[in-house]
Amino acid sequence: MAKQSAIEQDGAIIEALSNAMFRVELENGHIVIAHISGKMRMHYIKLLPGDKVKLEMSPYDLSKARITYRY
C-alpha cells in the first residue's frame, strides 16, 4: 500500500517548548505541536514566537507536525 502524502499548511509560532518543539497556530485556528525538520537543525535556523512557518502534517495524526520552512 502506498504511503499517504503529507498535508502542507501555514501557521504562526505561538510558544517555544522544550526539546526544539513549538506550539503553532494554523491558519484555520487549530493549534498543533511541531518539531523542526533535520535540514533546519543542520543549518541552525532559529525560530521565535510570531514567526510564520510552513508545516507538514501526517494524515494519520493531525495534532503533530514538522516545521519545514520559515518565511
Curated annotation (Swiss-Prot):
Q: Which InterPro entries match?
A: NA-bd_OB-fold, RNA-binding_domain_S1_IF1, TIF_IF1
PROSITE patterns in the record: S1_IF1_TYPE
Keywords on record: Cytoplasm, Initiation factor, Protein biosynthesis, RNA-binding, rRNA-binding
Please classify the protein's predominant subcellular localization into one broad category: cytoplasm
Mention one GO molecular function. Answer: translation initiation factor activity
SUPFAM superfamilies, alphabetized: Nucleic acid-binding proteins
One Gene Ontology CC term in the entry:
cytosol
Q: Where in the cell is it found?
A: Cytoplasm
Tell me where in this chain the S1-like domain is found. 1-71
Question: Which HAMAP family would you find in this protein's record?
Answer: IF_1
Q: Which NCBIfam families match?
A: infA
Partners and quaternary state?
Answer: Component of the 30S ribosomal translation pre-initiation complex which assembles on the 30S ribosome in the order IF-2 and IF-3, IF-1 and N-formylmethionyl-tRNA(fMet); mRNA recruitment can occur at any time during PIC assembly.
Purpose: One of the essential components for the initiation of protein synthesis. Stabilizes the binding of IF-2 and IF-3 on the 30S subunit to which N-formylmethionyl-tRNA(fMet) subsequently binds. Helps modulate mRNA selection, yielding the 30S pre-initiation complex (PIC). Upon addition of the 50S ribosomal subunit IF-1, IF-2 and IF-3 are released leaving the mature 70S translation initiation complex.
The family assignment reads: Belongs to the IF-1 family.
- Which named protein is this? Translation initiation factor IF-1
Protein's organism? Flavobacterium psychrophilum (strain ATCC 49511 / DSM 21280 / CIP 103535 / JIP02/86)
